[in-house]
Regions:
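Protein-protein interaction and targeting regions used for scaffolding, dimerization, and localization
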Residues: 1-120
Length: 120
């Protein structure tokens, strides 16, 4: 669905992409929204969120060579937002049923892409 719409992109480390796809496959095979699945999914979503926040909010400041004071203020604000996000994610995932788990796994699979080959 995303490829049919305009969208923004945030790079993630290869290790995180590999872990995301492995986790999606593992949890899809198990098909149960039990504590183990929720813990793995929570950890993955938190890492994806943290990478996205860094890229969309801190990377532009790094590219602008923002000073230490501005970077510290930005990090403090983003950390507060991140803590709030973690609480919400945790509350939502605690209430997951098997069908909702499958929907979240579909979404994660939809947003994870391998790097494109360089143009020649």
């Amino acid at each position: 669905m995303l490829k049919q719409q305009s969208h923004i992109v945030a790079p993630i480390p290869d290790e995180l992409r590999t872990r995301a796809l492995y986790t999606v496959n593992e949890l899809r095979e198990r098909g149960k929204a039990d504590k183990e699945a929720i813990d793995k999914l929570y950890s993955l979503i938190i890492d994806l969120t943290e990478n996205g926040l860094d890229f969309f909010f801190l990377e532009p400041l790094r590219r602008l060579k923002a000073g230490n004071m501005l970077m510290s203020m930005a990090k403090m604000g983003i950390n507060s937002m991140f803590k709030g996000s973690k609480m919400v994610i945790h509350k939502v995932l605690k209430k997951l049923d098997d069908r909702s788990l499958a929907s979240i796994l579909d979404f994660i699979e939809e947003i994870i892409h391998e790097p494109e080959a360089p143009a020649q």
